[in-house]
A protein has these predicted regions:
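Short amphipathic alpha-helical coiled-coil/interface segments
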Residues: 151, 155, 446-454
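Short, solvent-exposed helix-loop connector elements
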Residues: 295-300, 405-419, 429-442, 459-466
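Extended C-terminal regions of large enzymes
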Residues: 458, 462-544
């Protein structure tokens, strides 16, 4: 029987699932087994019936084998689970749902937006995106894989409650994630059902508000990303705008005024059913780590599909005010820079931003983190921006090194296959964002250090001299010199730079084992090969 792998140092075991985040996961005093109906010794009598689960809000749920709403963030790998993940979100999920959908279409002719939000095509697209994103379960304990079975049983009931205005969103589940600058950031995880409904609203409302957003806003918008924001700042720096107003909003998502936000939404949305549903999501509350429920009179919970759109709606007046004053700026969610040519203008711009944010938006500017400084000294979206290039910030490099150290820790007792798989996925994701930097020296330095960490892991895993000798010979080391390395008393870190070890564990061989080649990825992004011209058709022979 294979030995179970141990978790990374400082992380929870993957087998523990979502239910054991931070060592506890309660819902008003009930255990996860009591909420989902999975038999754990204290569940209801219904939970002992095979394939039956008790949903805390919607009642009994017949779940096919392999689709029990377990506390997992990923499907279990069974054929039934894989099939469920590919299932379309059919509106005719339960008895009477087909007639309900028809009545909905006939009875909503006065509101095209509401009809579009609940249309089968829009709900199917919302479910597809939620399924692709995955994520942890909400307070009801239902995973993404278990949602199709839930919808087949209760889809008609959910649609009926949405239609007659009696649907009540569930509170979000509070979880904490570490910040790059230290401390922890609170996230609110909605249930899968609420994620689908929020995503359906966001898809339709996004088209309504997209035309109202500023060209200097780059977050959570189609065809725009953080790289575009960084390029815009670099273009401004190249024009001589080298002084920056680096303004930080104190806990923006936790301090959004609901009345102001709903007034902004109501400027474009007239349907009271849409406005009522958005307001209920804002006031749904949060279940804390200790199981207590807390009201949310202010703020937008981070973690839901609707939150990014609401953040852009809330901050659009700030964009328009800066544009009215002729300021050059770039905003990505609540992170933004205002660019000016000199220090005097920067001080004046800082006063304008503080007065508008605190007076009109009723938000707070974090004076400890806001400053006026040279652009090259400011960090924006993890990068330092100069006139001619974009560099990685020290915090971004430290984050990379810390994560790679954990993944290549000599005390993490897992196979090299799993270790390198985790390393490859992390490096590909990290570099996919930070590849915009044009600092070749940083790329080479990080790549060299990462490969040294991997060679250290191999040397540690081989342990004894005979094993090391046999492995080196198998990898092509010279027989007359291999004993010099295999019998060395030097530590693993020092041996990772040994010429014999490096000649055996070459960069090319490490790449075949799953170690990414950072210089090759960087060159492929910044200097892509030219497209080959299409071959010309042979000329026709002249007819005499």
């Amino acid at each position: 029987m294979p030995r179970k792998s141990r978790p990374l140092p400082g992380e929870t075991c993957p087998a523990s699932g979502v239910a054991r985040e931070r060592g506890t996961d309660t819902d008003c005093g009930n255990t996860a087994g009591e909420r989902t109906g999975v038999s754990r010794g204290r569940s209801s009598a219904r939970s002992h019936e095979p394939g039956v689960s008790e949903h805390p809000k919607w009642g009994a749920l017949k779940v096919p084998e392999g689709l029990t709403p377990a506390r997992r963030t990923k499907p279990s790998g069974t054929a039934e689970t894989a099939a469920a993940c590919q299932l379309e979100l059919a509106l005719e999920a339960g008895p009477g749902a087909r007639s309900l959908a028809a009545e909905t279409d006939r009875g909503q002719s006065e509101s095209g937006l509401w009809r579009q939000c609940l249309s089968p095509a829009n709900l199917n697209e919302a479910w597809r995106r939620v399924r692709t994103n995955g994520g942890a379960a909400g307070i009801d304990g239902m995973s993404v894989a278990a949602f199709p079975a839930f919808w087949r049983a209760h889809g008609a009931q959910v649609l009926a409650k949405l239609e007659n205005g009696t649907y009540r969103p569930s509170p979000v589940r509070r979880t904490l994630i570490p910040k790059k600058t230290g401390g922890e950031r609170p996230l609110g995880i909605p249930t899968v059902l609420d994620r689908v409904i929020q995503q359906a609203l966001a898809q339709e409302l996004g088209g309504v508000f997209e035309a109202t957003f500023s060209e200097n806003s780059y977050a959570y918008r189609p065809g725009r990303n953080a790289h575009d924001a960084l390029r815009a700042v670099r273009a401004a720096a190249a024009e001589g705008l080298t002084e920056a107003v680096d303004c930080d909003l104190k806990s923006f998502f936790d301090h959004v005024d609901h009345d102001l936000l709903m007034a902004r939404v109501a400027d474009k949305v007239r349907d009271q059913r849409v406005l009522r549903l958005i307001g209920r999501y804002l006031r749904a509350g949060v279940v804390l780590l200790d199981g207590r429920k807390e009201r949310t009179p202010r703020g937008v919970p981070q973690g839901g599909p609707l939150s990014p759109l609401l953040a852009n709606i809330m901050l659009t007046p700030l964009d328009r005010e800066l544009e009215r004053r002729g300021r050059r700026f770039a905003r990505y969610a609540d992170d933004f820079l205002v660019l000016v040519p000199n220090r005097c203008e920067a001080e004046r711009a800082m006063g304008e931003v503080v007065a508008f944010v605190e007076g009109e938006l009723k938000l707070t500017v974090n004076a400890a983190k806001s400053r006026v400084d040279r652009l090259a000294r400011c960090t924006f979206l993890g990068c330092r921006i100069e006139r001619k290039q974009i560099r990685w910030s020290e915090a971004a490099v430290d984050e990379f090194r810390a994560k790679v150290r954990r993944l290549t820790s000599r005390t993490w007792g897992v196979s090299m296959e799993r270790r390198l798989g985790s390393l490859g996925r992390y490096v590909q994701g990290w570099f996919g964002y930070y590849r915009i930097s044009r600092t070749w020296g940083q790329v080479r330095e990080l790549d060299k250090w990462m490969r040294r960490r991997v060679r250290q892991c191999y040397w540690k895993q081989w342990k004894r001299g005979p094993t090391r000798r046999r492995r080196l010979l198998r990898l092509g080391a010279h027989p007359t010199t291999v004993h010099l390395a295999s019998r060395s008393r030097k530590g693993c870190w020092r041996m990772s730079t040994n010429s014999i070890v490096q000649a055996a564990l070459t960069n090319e061989w490490l790449e075949t084992q799953g170690v990414p080649d950072l210089p090759a990825l960087w060159v492929a992004y910044h200097y892509p090969p030219p497209l080959e011209p299409e071959p010309k058709a042979p000329a026709k022979a002249a007819v005499r």
